[in-house]
């Protein structure tokens, strides 16, 4: 029996589009289903000023295929040299919707990130004053901290002190991967939200390591124990408006994934909405999918919801998604959930 679900056109509140040929190849995969996306600024070199964000936005719009509608929501990469006045001007112009905090060395192209948080305090204070959200890659990078503990330690050592010392600062904990993070969000009464990725609702660390290394499941923050995956599912499907979709879809060519020091990231733009329908159906929460994917994010960012709609249809036969996206730089493998998916977007 065919089953369908029509929802407000969703948004992606954490997306990597890269630049150049890669941008042109992967942008349609997002624009096909999503109305808007928060665009990550970790290019080489990173997007650190309003002028650079404006130029990057122009390149994204120029790469958008004719007939597609999509609005890139730009961010700035926070560095120890970021100018509070430039941040305020970029926000006032309507260009920049958030500033991204990368602890130095935490993930792809994060070497320009923050090491001394006292040096960015004036920027954070200005952001609190003007209501501009801070998006955080929530991991410490200390060599003595186990990679599976980086998120929990970040909350204690970095995030909570920042929030305590900067009242009114609106924060998005991006791509949370632990029960600790979900519980922290719930424990706060205002000014805090969190994005959850599609792949962290599906995989745990066993998917990466059991039966041989699976490079296409390797991402940062790395997937955790099963108890954490289940906690993320509960948060995403709960209807709590503080949790919303941020895919962290991150295209890397197979050549860069399948090597002795492979890149971190899962490319989920192609099949995210179908996978989410599968997950929410498993949890008996299809009625909560629209909130998670289409309503909670705009509410946090104080933006209107999208005007359009998409329809998800469940078919009797499994849906065959592309295994790869061809790019001039080489193929990019589409995330494979390792189970049959019967949902598709029509």
From Swiss-Prot:
Task: Check the record and name the Gene3D superfamilies matching this protein.
Answer: Metal-dependent hydrolases (3.20.20.140)
- Please name the catalytic residues of this protein: 248
EC no.?
Answer: 3.5.2.3
**Per the UniProt entry, what is one GO biological process?**
'de novo' UMP biosynthetic process
Q: InterPro entries in the record, alphabetically?
A: Amidohydro-rel (IPR006680), DHOdimr (IPR004721), Dihydroorotase_CS (IPR002195), Metal_Hydrolase (IPR032466)
Q: Name one GO molecular function term.
A: zinc ion binding
- For the modification N6-carboxylysine, the affected residues are 100
| A GO cellular component annotation in the UniProt record | cytosol
UniProt: Zn(2+) 1 binding residues: 14, 16, 100, 248
Residues annotated for substrate binding in this entry: 16-18, 42, 137, 220, 252, 264
HAMAP family membership: PyrC_classII
Quaternary form?
Homodimer.
What name goes with this protein? Dihydroorotase
């Amino acid at each position: 029996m065919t089953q369908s679900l029509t929802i407000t056109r969703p948004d992606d509140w954490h997306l990597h589009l890269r630049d150049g040929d890669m941008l042109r190849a992967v942008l349609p995969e997002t624009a096909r289903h999503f109305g808007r996306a928060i665009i990550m600024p970790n290019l080489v070199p990173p997007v650190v000023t309003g002028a650079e964000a404006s130029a990057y936005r122009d390149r994204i719009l120029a790469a958008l295929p004719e007939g597609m509608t999509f609005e890139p929501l730009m961010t700035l990469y926070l560095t120890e040299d970021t100018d509070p006045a430039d941040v305020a001007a970029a926000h006032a112009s309507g260009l920049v919707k958030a500033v991204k905090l990368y602890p130095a060395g935490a993930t792809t192209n994060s070497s320009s990130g923050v090491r001394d948080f006292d040096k960015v305090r004036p920027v954070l204070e200005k952001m609190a004053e003007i209501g501009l959200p801070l998006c955080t890659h929530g991991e410490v990078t200390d060599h003595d901290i186990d990679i599976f503990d980086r998120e929990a330690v970040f909350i204690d050592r970095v995030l909570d002190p920042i929030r305590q010392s900067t009242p009114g600062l609106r924060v998005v904990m991006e791509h949370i991967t632990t029960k600790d993070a979900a519980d922290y969000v719930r424990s706060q009464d205002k000014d805090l939200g969190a994005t959850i990725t599609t792949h962290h609702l599906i995989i745990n660390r066993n998917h990466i390591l059991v039966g041989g290394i699976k490079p296409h499941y390797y991402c940062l923050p790395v997937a955790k124990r099963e108890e954490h995956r289940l906690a993320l599912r509960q948060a995403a499907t709960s209807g709590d408006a503080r949790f919303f979709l941020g895919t962290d879809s991150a295209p890397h060519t197979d050549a860069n994934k399948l090597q002795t020091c492979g890149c971190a990231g899962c490319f989920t733009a192609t099949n995210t909405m179908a996978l989410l329908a599968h997950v929410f159906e498993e949890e008996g929460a299809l009625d909560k999918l629209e909130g998670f994917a289409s309503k909670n994010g705009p509410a946090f960012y104080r933006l209107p919801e999208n005007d359009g709609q998409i329809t998800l249809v469940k078919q009797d036969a499994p849906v065959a998604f592309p295994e790869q996206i061809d790019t001039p730089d080489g193929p990019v493998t589409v995330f494979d959930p390792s189970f049959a998916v019967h949902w598709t977007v029509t």
